[in-house]
Amino acid sequence: KERKTEEVIKEEKIKTSEIKTNEVNDEKASRKNIIIIGIIILVLVLGGLYIYKVNKVKQEELYSKSYLIDSGTLNLEIKNIDEVNQILTEAPSEYFILITYTGNKATYNLETGLKEIVDKYKLSDSFYYLNIKDMMNEDNYLTRLNSTFNTDKIKTVPIILYYKDGKLIDTVTRYDKNVINASDFQRTLDIYEYQGQ
């Protein structure tokens, strides 16, 4: 009986030892799984941040340029406001001037929408582009624009000025807080029954 009892005690000790070993192994495996999950989450977060930053840089780069100029749709760019009068002395009898700024999704979308209209009406030789982004930090930039174009109708930008025979006929502008869009320009062309070049 004593031997059986000793054997039973030994077997129980072995079983207890095996259970403890299994518990330790399970605990190690559990820690390992937690570490692996943590690393996966960290990689996903860092990967997401990287993708976000890359997309943001690409967007900023895209919006920092004029779509109409870069695509070759327009080639009549007024690079300096002080050159406006000199440049416009050589303008055709009927022309348009887009006064806008870059670095903004809404103005970029305006330009992409205008491309189709410029192409449809063959306006590339009668459509001027003026980017005033650098000017917009000045307190009096609207006054300066109005003075340059000899008008008082420039209240906001972007705006499109429509000239015929040297006179400002109309402006394409919005009176709400939204940026003008291509359909606003199309509406003006329709009102004046503009046929194109």
List each model region and its residues.
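Extracytoplasmic/periplasmic, Sec-exported soluble proteins
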Residues: L76, K105-N109, D152
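Local sequence-structure signature of Cys/Sec-based thiol-disulfide redox active-site neighborhoods
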Residues: N85-S126
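N-terminal targeting leaders characterized by basic, low-complexity, disordered sequences
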Residues: K1-E18
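Thiol-based oxidoreductase modules, predominantly thioredoxin-like and allied folds used
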Residues: S71-N80, Y101, L123-T143
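N-terminal leader/targeting and pre-domain segments
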Residues: E12-K15, N25-V43, G47-S93, A182-Q197
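A short acidic (Asp/Glu
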Residues: T107-E111, D139-Y141, T173
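Thioredoxin-like thiol-disulfide oxidoreductase module
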Residues: Y128-D170, K177-Q195
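ER-lumen resident redox/N-glycosylation machinery signature
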Residues: G38, G113, I117-V118, L168-N181
